[in-house]
Amino acid sequence: MKELTNRQKMVLDFITSYIQQNGYSPSIRDIAKHFKLTPRGAHIHVLALEKKGYITRNPKNSRSISLVKRPETVSIPVKGKISAGQGIEMFELVDEEIEIPVRMINGYGNYFALRVEGTSMIEAHIIDGDYVILKKQYRIPNGQIAAVVFDNKVTLKRFYHKNDKVELVPENSSMSPIICDAKDVKVIGKLVGVIRIY
C-alpha cells in the first residue's frame, strides 16, 4: 500500500471511527462537513484512499465505503544513496521503492529510504548496503541520527547544533567528527529505522 498524506490519514481515521460508532460509513457530505471541506474536496480524499487501497466503495451508493484490512507493510520511495563516511554527491532520483513494516512509521509525515555507502555508522549498527528509513524533517533534537547536506554532499551522522556550529559525529571510533558552520548544513531527514537485505 502507498503511504498516506497527513490529511488522508485523518480522513481514514474519521471514516474508521464513524463506522465503529454508527455501524455504517459516512457519506461524502459527512466527511466534507467534519473537515470543513467542499464535497468535491472530500471526494478527492476518498478517491485517493480508494486508489491507495485503504478503502473500497460503490460510487452509486452514498454510504458504501468499506475499510480494507491494513497490510503489515507499506512502500516508500528509495531516493538514492547516502554516505556513512565523508559525504557523497547529492543523491540522484531513483525510481525504486522498498517495503517496510507499517509499525516503523506512524502514518503521518513523509518517509523515504536511502541506501548506505560506507562504515562511519557501524557502532550504531548501520552498515554498508543497509537502507535507512528517514522521516522528512528539517529540524531535529541534538543527539539524533540524521541525513544532512553540506558542501552539496549528503551524509548520515549523529547531529549536534552548538551556537553557530554543527558537529556531525560518526558512530565509528576510528573516525573524527565533521564540524561546519550551521548556515552551511541542512537537515533533510531523521532516522526512524534500518532495513538490511541479506
From Swiss-Prot:
Q: What gene is behind this protein?
A: lexA
Give the protein's function. Represses a number of genes involved in the response to DNA damage (SOS response), including recA and lexA. In the presence of single-stranded DNA, RecA interacts with LexA causing an autocatalytic cleavage which disrupts the DNA-binding part of LexA, leading to derepression of the SOS regulon and eventually DNA repair.
Q: How does it assemble?
A: Homodimer.
Q: Which residues bind DNA?
A: 28-47
What is the recorded name of this protein?
A: LexA repressor
Name a GO molecular-function annotation: DNA binding
Site note Cleavage applies to: A84, G85
Keywords noted in UniProt: Autocatalytic cleavage, DNA damage, DNA repair, DNA replication, DNA-binding, Hydrolase, Repressor, SOS response, Transcription, Transcription regulation
Q: What class of enzyme is it?
A: hydrolase
Which HAMAP family does the record associate with it?
Answer: LexA
Active-site residue list: S120 (for autocatalytic cleavage activity), K157 (for autocatalytic cleavage activity)
Cited InterPro entries: LexA (IPR006200), LexA-like (IPR039418), LexA/Signal_pep-like_sf (IPR036286), LexA_DNA-bd_dom (IPR006199), LexA_repressor (IPR050077), Peptidase_S24_LexA (IPR006197), Peptidase_S24_S26A/B/C (IPR015927), WH-like_DNA-bd_sf (IPR036388)
User: Is Mitochondrion set as a keyword in this record?
Assistant: no
Q: Which family does it belong to?
A: Belongs to the peptidase S24 family.
Q: Name one GO biological process term.
A: DNA repair
Which residues, by range, are in coiled-coil regions? none
Instruction: Name the chemical reaction catalysed here.
Output: Hydrolysis of Ala-|-Gly bond in repressor LexA
UniProt EC number: 3.4.21.88
